Amino acid sequence: DLSHKNHYVVGLGLCMLGSICSAEMARDVAGEVEGLLSHGNSYVRKKAALTATRVIKKVPELCEGFVDAAEALLSDRHHGVLLAACTLATEMCEKDAEVQTRMRSQVPQLCKVLKSLIYAGKSAEHDIAGHADPFLQVAILRLLRVLGRGDADASDAMSDILAQIASNTDGSKNAGNAILYEAVETIIAIEAVGGLRVLAVNILGRFL
């Protein structure tokens, strides 16, 4: 099924693998899943990234084999693929400190995507309550939190975008509150400067 011409059949096979694969099966199919991360169809890339996440949960030592593909996916223009890539990268960084160190090179790219979402105009496809794809914004913030933890340089690189989110996001709707909450969690977790932490505390005060 993973080599079928119909991308929906490939997606179904990937979903099955993600749902039922054992550690032994994960090792057997890891190479095929990695290859599908660069598939020409965005639907297959998204499903492959989600399946790779499940594979890594089963066998954490397979992380290293997915790093190059995961880094490439973080520059994908398709929102669904990018969301799945953030989930994959977050899982990999939490499982392997060496992968976390290597993935820190992606912080500028992630900040660039986040900035484009913050200042994007309303889009019928991705807009929720006036916010451009809050699900993707939350996923990127969670990944930034993992990458910035314990690293001053990475934390400094993401401080500007975190300040912009904290200052400009409308918290009158649930979508905005979800983004603000993740931004606060990220600011608290990373090596943030004092002014940014004050901003986070003020947002927490509004939540109470």
Residue ranges, per PLM feature:
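Extended alpha-solenoid helical-repeat scaffolds
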Residues: 1-208
